[in-house]
Amino acid sequence: MKLSALRLSTLILSLLASGLASAETYIVDRYQDDSAKGSLRWAIEQSNANAAHENEIQIQAVGKAPYVIKLNQALPRIKSSVKIIGMQWDKTGEFIAIDGSNYIKGEGAKACPGANSEQYGTNVRTTTLPGLVLQDVNGVTLKGLDIHRFCIGVLVNRSSNNLIQHNRISNNYGGSGVMLTGDDGKGNPTSTTTNNNKVLNNLFVDNGDGLELTRGAAFNLVANNLFTSTKANPEPSQGIEILWGNDNAVIGNKFENYSDGLQINWGKRNYIAYNELTNNSIGFNLTGDGNIFDSNKVHGNRLGIAIRSEKDANARTTLTKNLIWGN
C-alpha cells in the first residue's frame, strides 16, 4: 500500500511539474525582423513550438516612441494559446506597432488581391496578406498593439474564445482591420468554428472594412470600439460587415465617416444595441432575418437606415427604442 501511494504521489508531482513548465513567457526586446532571440518572429516561433496553454509574449518599448516593428515578410501563423501584449499600453496608453509596409507594396487596395487574384477591393472574398493570423486556434489574447498596413490586420479564421482588446487597428486596406470568418478555405461557411470571440475597446482607424463577421462567425461580441475613417483612407467601406454571420452582439460602438456604418447581408438573429452612427453615407444597411436594433443613435448620416429586400418573405427586422434624427 505504501509503495502504491508513493508511486501515485510521484506521478502527481511529475504531472504538476509538467504543467508548471508548460507555460512560458517570451520577451521581445529587439525590433529587427529575424529569428534571433528577442524578436517578435522568434517569440511566435517559440510559442508555437511549445504549443502549451497560456504562453505570453511581452513586447517591450525599445528606444523612443513611436515604437514600430517593421516586418520584411509575413509572420508565422499563431498555433498556440498565447497572450501577445504591447507592454507600454498599461504604462502610458501607447501602442507598439506591427507594420507590414516593408513587404506589402502597391497602391492602396490594389496591393491586396482577393481569393481570385484578378480581383481586389474591400468587398471581394479574401484572406490575403494578414498581419496576425489566428487560424484553427483558441485562447489567444492581443493587447496594446497597433496592427498597421496589412491587407487584413488580424485574421481570426475557424478560431474561438479569443480576445482582441485595447489595440489600434489602422490602415489595413483591401480586406479589413479584423476579420472573423468561418471560411473553410473554399468560400463556404462553417457554423461552429468561429464562436465566442471578443473584440473590445479598440480603435479602428482608416481600414477598408473596420471589422467583418462572415461565413458562419457566430456568438461573438464586438463592444465599445471606435470605427472611424479619415480623408487618408482610399476605400472606406463598412465599419462592420456581417455576411452570413448569426447570433452576434454588436454593442456600444461608434461608427463614423464610412460608406455604411454597419451592413448586414443575410445574417440572422444579431443583436445591435447602444451604438452611435454618424456622418456615414448610410448608418445601417440591412438584409437578414431576426436581427434586432435596440437603443442606437443614428444621426447626421446621408441616409439613416436602409432595409433592403430579403428573399424570405417572412423575414423580420426589429427596430426598438432607437434615436434617429438629422439624416
Per-region residue spans from a language model:
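Bacterial N-terminal signal peptides that target proteins for export
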Residues: M1-T10
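Cleavable N-terminal signal peptides
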Residues: T10-L11, A21
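Short loop/turn segments at connectors of secondary-structure elements within structured domains
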Residues: S22, A51-H53, A65, I78, ...
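Extracellular beta-strand/beta-solenoid scaffold signature
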Residues: E107-V133, R149-V156, N171-T194, V205-A217, ...
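N-terminal, post-signal-peptide segments of secreted/periplasmic proteins
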Residues: A23-G153, R158-S160, W325-G326
